[in-house]
């Protein structure tokens, strides 16, 4: 059997029980915790025949790096999707697909926040390069608040090649750049779209930028010149959602 990993936090563990219960092998609860959220977890665990035990908080503190909220689960390792799965995802898409690409985002908290935002905005998947990128870890899952168990994270060997293949399938690539002439709100995002966010400070890599069909910038009205990448991602994805929702209305 593959070595188990520990996932922690109420939202992350609850999402696993709801979407991938077979991966959950055992749940640990902090001694004395019996609030409504924990009772929900206990009920879900019982439905899926997952065993539950108790542990001291200081013992749980030693298991994980982060705020575990008194909930830790032993789970089978997850698999990050590969490039070959993109075609399957696109074939299953019921409307114009919306994909998010994170080019060089290495901070686990930013990745977790972007996964959460991407799921909330209806993105089909999040794509990252295999090198120079954060990947799924317990910390990422905790920040994602369950979204990491729902939205596929696709790691690709050659991002430029992946973008070319997606363009051949009819998707438009929209990259974000502070010096772009067109503002985000002027760009049509209602069709099959890929939104690319670069690393903070560095932006997109040169080859990634060269594969963009459009470049857009976020208008800034204050004294700061940029936003945290997870915040900027939320602005872009929810503008796409706003445009798509408006287009669907009669």
Curated annotation (Swiss-Prot):
Record field: catalytic activity: guanosine(2251) in 23S rRNA + S-adenosyl-L-methionine = 2'-O-methylguanosine(2251) in 23S rRNA + S-adenosyl-L-homocysteine + H(+)
Subcellular location: Cytoplasm
Molecular-function annotations in GO: RNA binding; rRNA (guanosine-2'-O-)-methyltransferase activity
Enzyme Commission number(s): 2.1.1.185
Keywords from the named record: Cytoplasm, Methyltransferase, rRNA processing, S-adenosyl-L-methionine, Transferase
Classification via Gene3D superfamilies: 3.30.1330.30, 3.40.1280.10
GO cellular component: cytosol
Alphabetized Pfam families for the sequence: SpoU_methylase, SpoU_sub_bind
PANTHER family per record: 23S RRNA (GUANOSINE-2'-O-)-METHYLTRANSFERASE RLMB (PTHR46429:SF1)
NCBIfam families with a match to the protein in the record: rRNA_methyl_3
Function: Specifically methylates the ribose of guanosine 2251 in 23S rRNA.
Name of the protein in its database record: 23S rRNA (guanosine-2'-O-)-methyltransferase RlmB
Organism expressing this protein natively: Pseudomonas syringae pv. tomato (strain ATCC BAA-871 / DC3000)
Lineage: Bacteria, Pseudomonadati, Pseudomonadota, Gammaproteobacteria, Pseudomonadales
């Amino acid at each position: 059997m593959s070595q188990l990993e520990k996932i922690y936090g109420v939202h992350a563990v609850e999402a696993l029980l709801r979407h991938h219960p077979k991966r959950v092998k055992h749940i640990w609860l902090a001694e004395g915790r019996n609030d409504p959220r924990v009772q929900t977890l206990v009920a879900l665990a019982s439905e899926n025949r997952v065993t539950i035990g108790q542990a001291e908080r200081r013992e749980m503190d030693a298991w994980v790096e982060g705020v575990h909220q008194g909930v830790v689960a032993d789970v089978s390792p997850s698999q990050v999707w590969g490039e070959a799965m993109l075609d399957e995802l696109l074939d299953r898409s019921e409307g114009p697909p919306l994909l998010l690409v994170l080019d060089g985002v290495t901070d686990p908290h930013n990745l977790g926040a972007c996964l959460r935002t991407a799921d909330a905005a209806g993105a089909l998947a999040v794509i990252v390069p295999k090198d120079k990128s954060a990947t799924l870890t317990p910390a990422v899952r905790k920040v994602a608040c369950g979204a990491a168990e729902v939205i596929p994270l696709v790691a690709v060997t050659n991002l430029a090649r992946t973008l070319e293949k997606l363009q051949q399938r009819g998707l438009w690539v929209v990259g974000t750049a502070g010096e772009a002439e067109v503002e985000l709100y002027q760009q049509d995002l209602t069709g099959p779209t890929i939104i690319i966010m670069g690393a903070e400070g560095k932006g997109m890599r040169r080859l990634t930028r060269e594969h963009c069909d459009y470049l857009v910038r976020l208008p800034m009205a204050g004294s700061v010149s940029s936003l945290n990448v997870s915040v900027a991602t939320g602005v872009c994805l929810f503008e796409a959602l706003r445009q798509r929702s408006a287009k669907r209305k009669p």
